[in-house]
């Protein structure tokens, strides 16, 4: 039995041989190709030896016709170790389950703390956090990273300027900086309406005040459109002029559109892999063999694991893999011109008031160079040009 590792896997049994025919019994074992080792003869009627577990049945048959008896002392090797483990499995499983439960509890969210926010903002933030799973009782390794949580809150809450996210063990701490809305300045009760830019008047809707212009009049920036001083010289009254004065204004825009554009698009195919990281070693948990994509986008989210408040050298990592492919958008010259006009209109309207509209547009210049179409566009816009100007006493 020179191969100790093989013997450990098969299993060995230490036996005691008692009787007069010990030597004859041992010789019979050799003839039956039963491997015997570590034979120790105490006296003429007592000896000990080691046999393989698989030869126990053969030994039982041989001992029937022998002038001696055998006693099994102990067994060693993997089969006996397995048997002992199974015998004590209840305790082992209970012990293991205890630590697994402690580990899971140590990686759950038990507290969400928000500081620096008014009660109304805090309530709103708590609801937003619950939508993405950041609440008491959730597993931390199933949540988004602090950076993504921070981005989500700033994108979905208009009343905060900044929010800091910090994970301390089983607690999530949020430090909020709210927007300081400027207090509305107390406006003077008396005011004129003046033109905020050059225009040709197209319409007037005056609620209070004395109109000083009429339709088709050309006005310059700063010119009074509706006076807050009404009445005649004998019966003069000062009011807060109120209303809307629409005028035709003019804008110029430069827009360029490439005829060919290369970009990457997601195909919709993808998968998610999960790993348990131990320093430099990464063990896959599931999603082992997945399709390899020629071009892909990979997003990794790593969550450190804790045992109570202590950070373990273990971390859970989720890797989302999405397939992407190259795509090319090609415009004809006419299509590029139409796209440029569309972009120009959208860009202009985004800078104007809600009730502004484009009356007309004209391409002043058009050229194609280096795979791009460039347009110089003139716009005619109808918009409210009225702005307020306080009336100072003594005017």
Curated annotation (Swiss-Prot):
Keyword Transmembrane helix among record annotations: yes
A Pfam family recorded for this sequence: YqfD
Protein's UniProt name: Putative stage IV sporulation protein
InterPro entries tied to this protein: YqfD (IPR010690)
Keywords for this protein: Membrane, Sporulation, Transmembrane, Transmembrane helix
Keyword Transmembrane: yes
Location, primary (coarse class): membrane
Family: To B.subtilis YqfD.
Function noted in UniProt: May have a role in completing stage IV of sporulation.
Segments crossing the lipid bilayer: 90-110
GO biological process: sporulation resulting in formation of a cellular spore
Cysteines engaged in disulfide bonds, as pairs: none
GO CC term (a single one): membrane
